[in-house]
């Protein structure tokens, strides 16, 4: 039985409040800065109260302010990031799910060897993989394309490993029942594995969507056309703007808008996490 200790509860709540402040203050600071002019932002000390240019900054950023700075509209930057993040998340889940399904439920020569070949890629540094991958993308003519931005990032040894470990916990009785019912591999996957894996898929989707949304190095390498830049690349280019002083008001507006899609994904998928905690899957 857990004892009710008032002091312990107070300390726990204080730690929780402190954690919330540490996480939320940079976002609040960015939002406040997005309501000010660039001169107000760089003039110390910056006020912690909202400024008078909130609607003007967001309107100007959306209707051409960002485009004048980086050569591409804010809407296009957000769209590119959304396409890249969604394609990477879905691609990783589909490929990893099918790979783990084949490794666990099919009997073919060297299947464990293939699994360890996939798993060992986790030990390779990004620098080792990125140069040959870039060479392949150049040879295939995929520079400045969505395929070049997403295809090399779709394979995931981590997701394959997680799906494999989950599939190994599937009771053998379910597999035998499917065989008795004359269910083929596709039907077994559709009717049994997918329903059982929905919370795992939801959790991975959130993680992988954020992973795709925050990509910086790979989009920087494979995009030369500003119209193919993602929101992260756009932010970097605004900060490095050299024709005049950095437009910090647009930078802050873009940063706030860049936060919204990942937050929406987390909020929309949250009930699947709760469902996974309170329900028995098998």
From Swiss-Prot:
Cellular localization per UniProt? Cell inner membrane
Domain (ABC transmembrane type-1): residue spans on this chain: 78-269
Q: What is this protein called?
A: sn-glycerol-3-phosphate transport system permease protein UgpE
Organism in which the protein naturally occurs: Agrobacterium fabrum (strain C58 / ATCC 33970)
InterPro entries reported for this sequence:
MetI-like, MetI-like_sf
Q: How does it sit in the membrane?
A: Multi-pass membrane protein
Q: What is its biological role?
A: Part of the ABC transporter complex UgpBAEC involved in sn-glycerol-3-phosphate (G3P) import. Probably responsible for the translocation of the substrate across the membrane.
Transmembrane annotation, as ranges: 14-34, 86-106, 112-132, 146-168, 201-221, 248-268
One of the GO BP terms on file: transmembrane transport
Give the encoding gene's name.
ugpE
Assembly and partners are described as: The complex is composed of two ATP-binding proteins (UgpC), two transmembrane proteins (UgpA and UgpE) and a solute-binding protein (UgpB).
């Amino acid at each position: 039985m857990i004892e009710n200790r008032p002091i312990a509860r107070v300390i726990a709540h204080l730690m929780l409040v402190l954690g919330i402040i540490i996480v939320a203050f940079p976002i609040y600071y960015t939002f406040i800065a997005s309501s000010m002019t660039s001169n107000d932002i760089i003039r110390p000390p910056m006020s912690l109260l909202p400024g008078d240019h909130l609607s003007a900054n967001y309107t100007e950023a959306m209707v051409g302010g960002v485009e004048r700075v980086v050569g591409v509209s804010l809407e296009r930057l957000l769209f590119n990031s959304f396409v890249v993040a969604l394609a990477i998340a879905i691609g990783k889940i589909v490929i990893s799910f099918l790979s783990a399904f084949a490794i666990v439920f099919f009997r073919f020569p060297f299947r464990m060897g293939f699994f360890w070949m996939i798993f060992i890629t986790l030990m390779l540094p990004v620098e080792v993989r990125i140069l040959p991958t870039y060479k392949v993308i150049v040879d295939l003519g995929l520079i400045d394309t969505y395929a070049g931005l997403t295809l090399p990032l779709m394979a995931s040894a981590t997701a394959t490993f997680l799906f494999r470990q989950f599939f190994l916990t599937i009771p053998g009785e379910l597999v035998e029942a499917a065989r008795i019912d004359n269910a083929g591999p596709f039907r077994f996957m559709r009717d049994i594995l997918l329903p059982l894996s929905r919370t795992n898929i939801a959790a991975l989707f959130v993680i992988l969507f954020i992973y795709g949304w925050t990509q910086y190095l790979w989009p920087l390498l494979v995009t030369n056309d500003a119209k193919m830049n993602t929101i992260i690349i756009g932010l970097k280019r605004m900060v490095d703007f050299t024709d005049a002083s950095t437009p910090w008001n647009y930078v802050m507006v873009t940063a706030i808008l860049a936060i919204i899609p990942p937050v929406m994904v987390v909020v929309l998928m949250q009930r699947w996490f709760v469902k996974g905690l309170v329900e028995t899957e098998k």
